[in-house]
Amino acid sequence: KKLKALALKSAQDFLALYDSVPDKNATAAPERKTFYGQVPRTANEMYEHTKNVNTYYFAEIAVEADHDGNIYECRKRGFESLESNPDFLQNTVRKGSYGEDWSLRKVLRRFIWHDRIHAKAMYRMAIKVFGAEHVANPFCF
């Protein structure tokens, strides 16, 4: 319950940070590519990337999810889908993509970790472009 509450609060905080950025398409970062592809540079790119991993993480534990609506709404629906399975608290370990083991606990931790790394990048970029006084800091960076 605590990890779920943290994962949902993390989504709310991410949305609050994103909503506070005055221009969602501004950036201070140069284009950069990794083996995963282009690195998100704008608040909008970071938000869409972070929101869209909901389907990936939930799929790793065989839960149907989507990324419609905002990050909080789609994460909440993912948890509702998860909790419709009577055995969801068994913390079953499943083989996911690339042979990696996944459990509910791991998915919860990963949501929090992933939100935080992209929130920090978004916050740093936004204060560089707009100044700290114009950007919310719900993660207390």
Each PLM stretch: what is its role?
Residues 1-20, 65-97, 102-121:
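Acidic/histidine-rich alpha-helical segments that form the ligand environment
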Residues 24-72, 97-141:
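Short, contiguous alpha-helical
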